Regions:
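Class I (Rossmann-like) S-adenosyl-L-methionine-dependent methyltransferase catalytic domain
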Residues: 1-45, 50, 56-106, 149-220
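A short acidic, Gly/Pro-enriched loop at the edge of an enzyme's catalytic core
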Residues: 109-118
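A short beta-strand submotif of the Rossmann-like class I SAM-dependent methyltransferase core
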Residues: 120-123
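Conserved helix-to-beta-strand junction in the class I
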Residues: 139-146
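Short conserved AdoMet
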Residues: 128, 145, 192-193
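A short, conserved alpha-helix within the catalytic core of class I
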Residues: 127-139
Length: 220
């Protein structure tokens, strides 16, 4: 059964907004390991302009800015992005970082072929249907310049939480108020259709631990 509606995603948006407001800087200030890796890949590819989707309070966006990239950071939580803007100002990075509240179920508010690289850490595996994920990746391809790189991470069906908690259909399960779309490998492959799939790297993060893939693909 492929069940997904706007109610779950809207509830998740409200949940994240409350979470960021109640726990400023909840992920700390150190960048994620995937962001550190991505910065090296982006630099080697000659990228200058980076779009981060699902930036949260901005630890990775700030890292990209520190590393010399110009960053456009989006998230559906205004609370998280406000923390990001304040930190960017205090670090002298305000000119390198712009923010926009955006729901990835809607088209990206960017022109065609306008960014060199896109990064999304655990954004695609949120409460998005398979159809919505495909639409988002098509739009990411649209805004990337030729030879642009897209790096994303997702929890996959080998994760200990897969198949447990509250089921919402379409491989989406909810734990502790947070809904996760666990990726099967064939979804990764289908999202790379028309791209060059450079790497699917398996890694673990946090307690449990969470089991994820870090996917790198390049727009032709």
């Amino acid at each position: 059964m492929q069940h997904h509606d706007g109610d779950l995603a809207d509830t998740q948006q409200e949940h994240w907004q409350r979470t960021y407001a109640a726990h400023p800087g909840m992920y700390g200030q150190e960048p994620s390991a995937p962001a550190v890796h991505a910065a090296g890949v982006f630099r080697a590819n000659g990228a200058k302009d980076v779009l981060e989707l699902g930036a949260g309070h901005g630890r990775d966006a700030l890292y990209f800015a520190h590393e010399g990239f110009t960053v456009q950071a989006t998230d559906f939580s205004a609370a998280g992005l406000e923390q990001l803007k304040n930190t960017a100002r205090s670090h002298g990075l305000a000119e390198r970082v712009t923010t926009a509240v955006h729901d990835v179920r809607e088209p990206l508010p960017l022109p065609d072929a306008s960014v060199d690289a896109v990064f999304a850490h655990m954004l695609l595996c949120m409460a998005l249907s398979t159809q919505e994920i495909h639409a988002l990746v098509r739009d990411i391809r649209r805004v990337l310049r030729p030879d642009g790189v897209f790096i994303y991470t997702v929890r996959h069906t080998g994760d200990a939480h897969y198949g447990t908690g509250t089921p919402h259909g379409d491989d989406i399960y909810e734990h502790g108020g947070f809904a996760v779309h666990f990726f099967p490998r064939h979804l990764v492959d289908s999202l790379a259709d028309g791209w060059t799939l450079n790497e699917v790297h398996t890694f673990e993060e946090g307690e449990l631990p969470r089991r994820l893939w870090r996917v790198t693909q390049t727009r032709p």
